[in-house]
Every structure is written in structure tokens, then in C-alpha cells.
Amino acid sequence: LTCVTGKSIGGISTEECAAGQKICFKKWTKMGPKLYDVSRGCTATCPKADEYGCVKCCKTDRN
């Protein structure tokens, strides 16, 4: 599985997931008005969202 770890004007960066990590995730945490901290990567289980953010998980490449 290949997950996106970052996006920028120059394109996307990806990582190959380790054995046992079969889910890609994207997690947004609200830092202020229209300002979010975004993290992406591979995981074994979908992380939980906190009260200021949300999480999207998938099992497909490059999402």
C-alpha cells in the first residue's frame, strides 16, 4: 500500500506502508479560523478524531 504523506505546489510525497499497516489516513486538526494542521500516512488502525478535527481513512493507494 502506498499512502500520500504530503501535498504541495511541487506535487505529492508518498510512503510505502510497513507490514501490518494497511490503512492510509488523513487527519485535520483545527488550529484557528481557516487554519488546519494536516497529517497523513500509514497506520494499522484508523485514528480517532478529537473534538477539533476529523479523520478520513481508506485502503486504496495514493489517497
From Swiss-Prot:
Statement: the UniProt record of this protein carries the keyword Endoplasmic reticulum: no
Tissues of expression: Expressed by the venom gland.
Disulfide bridge partners, by residue number: 3-24, 17-42, 46-57
Subcellular location: Secreted
InterPro entries on file: Snake_3FTx, Snake_toxin-like_sf, Snake_toxin_con_site, Toxin_cobra-type
GO molecular-function terms, A-Z: toxin activity
Known partners and oligomeric status: Heterodimer of C9S3 chain 1 and chain 2 (AC P01409); disulfide-linked.
Role description: This protein shows a synergetic toxic effect in that it enhances the toxicity of other toxins.
Designated name of the protein: Synergistic-type venom protein C9S3, chain 1
Organism, scientific name: Dendroaspis angusticeps
